[in-house]
From Swiss-Prot:
Keywords: Amino-acid transport, Cell membrane, Cystinuria, Disease variant, Disulfide bond, Glycoprotein, Membrane, Phosphoprotein, Signal-anchor, Transmembrane, Transmembrane helix, Transport. It comes from the Eukaryota. Its main location: membrane. Changing V183A: In CSNU; uncertain significance; impairs protein stability and dimer formation. Residues 1-11 have a biased composition (Basic and acidic residues). It comes from Homo sapiens (Human). This is Amino acid transporter heavy chain SLC3A1.
Length: 685
């Protein structure tokens, strides 16, 4: 009976097209039963005969494997040997994801803000008329700058800063702007500017440009409309009635121009006097007029749309004047008022840094913020307020919750006419002590409005000043030519007659020893080149291992690669009339840099007595004398030549900023600690 039943089942399955589930198992225990050896062969034959039904198999009706039924799948998956590993893997995955999320949140919360592009490396300031002439007309231009971008990148520069190139009159070195939206033909075309922006960005660099909001040229269309009282332009400038006595114009008050004499000039067209803080060809805009403020913001938007990465706002302390017309107070009160003609003879309490001026500057910052939303496209804003006291200058950083300038340009080192360890220390500490907490410092040793370093202090101080520049905390800023030690030009007959002192610092860049120092192929250049260009030029110094250019490149590279320099603490050790000594250090890095700079005559320094735990000998990481690089010197008797600088590297865990004795002598902008295990910075030190 059993055999007949088996046959019937097999026949039925064949008739159904062999839709069998060969993976089906009634009971797991059946698989573990040992078959009867005696019946194995018979059962196999019977089964084969029952299923196939003939000698030759017929697969025509066979369908694909249908899979395990749901009920069976649940039965298997519910068994302990499958369920437990599955649950373990699931909860391990959940735990891993939660750990990763928590770690990510912790890293973000504890990590300091990454340095922005304007903090990461040096800025290079270019006076475009003197950098490189591309069209043989004797004037530097925008194409010339583009041609020299490879040189700039070789210096490890991160930001190119170009001074005024707007369409302007020749007065005051192109700072009397006729059209803020046009490139002066001397420098090229708007297409040249756009190509320059693209080339700078292709090199991974950023571009900031000068912008002078305080005044325009008297040839500007706004002024022409204002002097004829045309519509809204009537009050775009500062106009007041003047009186006339014996054919002489009597101004409204005793306010003086920066260049001397009255800051009021009578205009015959309007029959009134207009106010000018600078030259009479540069009338001051009326920033108490909201339309003027909006016009300036529109100009900022125009250049931001062109792709510039930021602005240097010049002469911002002059934006507002007092509403009243009271006389400013004389420095020498016994001086006869009619003889007061020089700017330095008055206290300028009514014509500079007026209430509301910082609000205007903040509004410029807000305009730039509208273009700073894309990652990596933050728009920088710096301010120039020349000859301000440090406590007033740092006010341009803004308030804790109201941002203003990213930093006001710090030109106080470039104002030193004599140098010593004491004077350098005073400039450094004055800035760091007055700078608001959490703000970023910057340093300049030269600029277009000051005498060049070599001529001001002496050629022997070029290298040590550049070493100072790159080892101080913050952004180093270099005026073109300072990297090779260019000096002022000495010429009896200059092409243009303005302030001779500042004109001499704008001489053509010295590229090589060919005609015109490689600056131009023209027969005449707008200013003569310095007579020392045969020996002081880029090509010569490229091949000299001990040149100023080679040291500059080494310093720039060290600054870029060392967290101690670009993120670390600055701790002052000692200074006197000769030298200044300080350290750069960072929590988590068990070594420090000890910087020793001599600004006086030759001297002997005992460094071992300044810092406890110093070894008898210490290795020089970098020196103004390249022959000393890598050597070890006796720390108890370090001989320093005039203008010599040394950077020592010392392995220690005893950092100075943690010590009570140095607590008031250490500064840091944004506190950070380094984890060598994770290779990250964090703030919870």
């Amino acid at each position: 009976m059993a055999e007949d039943k088996s046959k019937r089942d097999s026949i039925e399955m064949s008739m159904k097209g062999c839709q069998t589930n060969n993976g089906f198992v009634h009971n797991e225990d059946i698989l573990e039963q040992t078959p009867d050896p005696g019946s194995s062969t018979d059962n196999l034959k019977h089964s084969t005969r029952g299923i196939l039904g003939s000698q030759e198999p017929d697969f025509k009706g066979v369908q694909p494997y249908a899979g395990m039924p749901k009920e069976v799948l649940f039965q298997f998956s519910g068994q302990a040997r499958y369920r437990i590993p599955r649950e373990i893997l699931f909860w391990l995955t959940v735990a891993s994801v939660l750990v990763l999320i928590a770690a990510t949140i912790a890293i973000i919360a504890l990590s300091p803000k990454c340095l922005d592009w304007w903090q990461e490396g040096p800025m290079y300031q270019i006076y475009p008329r003197s950098f490189k002439d591309s069209n043989k007309d004797g004037n530097g231009d925008l194409k010339g700058i583009q041609d020299k971008l490879d040189y700039i990148t070789a210096l490890n520069i991160k930001t190119v800063w170009i001074t005024s190139f707007y369409k302007s009159s020749l007065k005051d070195f192109r700072y009397g702007v006729e059209d803020f939206r046009e490139v002066d033909p001397i420098f090229g075309t708007m297409e040249d500017f756009e190509n320059l922006v693209a080339a700078i960005h292709d090199k991974g660099l950023k571009l900031i440009i000068d912008f002078i909001p305080n005044h325009t040229s008297d040839k500007h269309i706004w002024f022409q409309l204002s002097r004829t009282r045309t519509g809204k332009y009537t009050d775009y400038y500062i106009w007041h009635d003047c009186t006339h006595e014996n054919g002489k114009t009597i101004p409204p008050n005793n306010w003086l121009s920066v260049y001397g004499n009255s800051s009021w000039h009578f205009d015959e067209v309007r029959n009134q006097c207009y106010f000018h803080q600078f030259m009479k060809e540069q009338p001051d805009l009326n920033f108490r007029n909201p339309d003027v403020q909006e016009e300036i913001k529109e100009i900022l938007r125009f250049w931001l749309t062109k792709g510039v990465d930021g602005f240097s706002l010049d002469a911002v302390k002059f934006l507002l004047e007092a509403k009243h017309l009271r006389d400013e107070i004389q420095v020498n009160k016994t001086q006869i008022p009619d003889t007061v003609t020089q700017y330095s003879e008055l206290y300028h309490d009514f014509t500079t840094t007026q209430v509301g001026m910082h609000d205007i500057v903040r509004s410029f910052r807000q305009t730039m913020d509208q273009y700073s939303t894309e990652p990596g496209r933050y728009r920088f804003m710096g301010t120039e307020a020349y000859a301000e006291s440090i406590d007033r200058t740092v006010m341009y950083y803004g308030l804790p919750f109201i941002q203003e300038a990213d930093f006001p340009f710090n030109n106080y080192l470039s104002m030193l006419d004599t140098v010593s360890g004491n004077s350098v220390y005073e400039v450094i500490t004055s800035w760091m002590e007055n700078m608001p907490e959490g703000k970023w410092p910057n340093w300049m040793i030269g600029g277009p409005d000051s005498s060049r370093l070599t001529s001001r202090l002496g050629n022997q101080y070029v290298n040590v000043m550049n070493m100072l520049l790159f080892t101080l905390p913050g952004t180093p800023i270099t005026y073109y030519g300072e990297e090779i030690g260019m000096g002022n030009i000495v010429a009896a007959n200059l092409n243009e007659s303005y302030d001779i002192n500042t004109l001499r610092s704008k001489s053509p860049m010295q590229w090589d020893n060919s005609s015109n120092a490689g600056f131009s192929e023209a027969s005449n250049t707008w200013l003569p080149t310095n007579s020392d260009y045969h020996t002081v030029n880029v090509d010569v110094q490229k091949t000299q291992p001990r040149s100023a250019l080679k040291l500059y490149q080494d310093l720039s590279l060290l600054h870029a690669n060392e967290l101690l320099l670009n993120r670390g603490w600055f701790c002052h050790l000692r200074n006197d009339s000769h030298y200044v000594v300080y350290t750069r250090e960072l929590d988590g890095i068990d070594r420090i840099f000890i910087v020793v700079l001599n600004f006086g005559e030759s001297t002997l320094l005992n460094l071992h007595n300044m810092i406890s735990g110093l070894p008898a000998k210490m290795r020089i990481r970098l020196s103004t004398n390249s022959a000393d690089k890598g050597s070890k010197v006796d720390t108890s008797g370090i001989f320093l030549d005039k203008g010599e600088g040394l950077i020592f590297e010392h392995n220690t865990k005893n950092l100075l900023h943690r010590q009570t004795a140095f607590r008031d002598r250490c500064f840091v902008s944004n506190r950070a600690c380094y984890s060598s295990v994770l290779n990250i910075l964090y703030t919870s030190c």
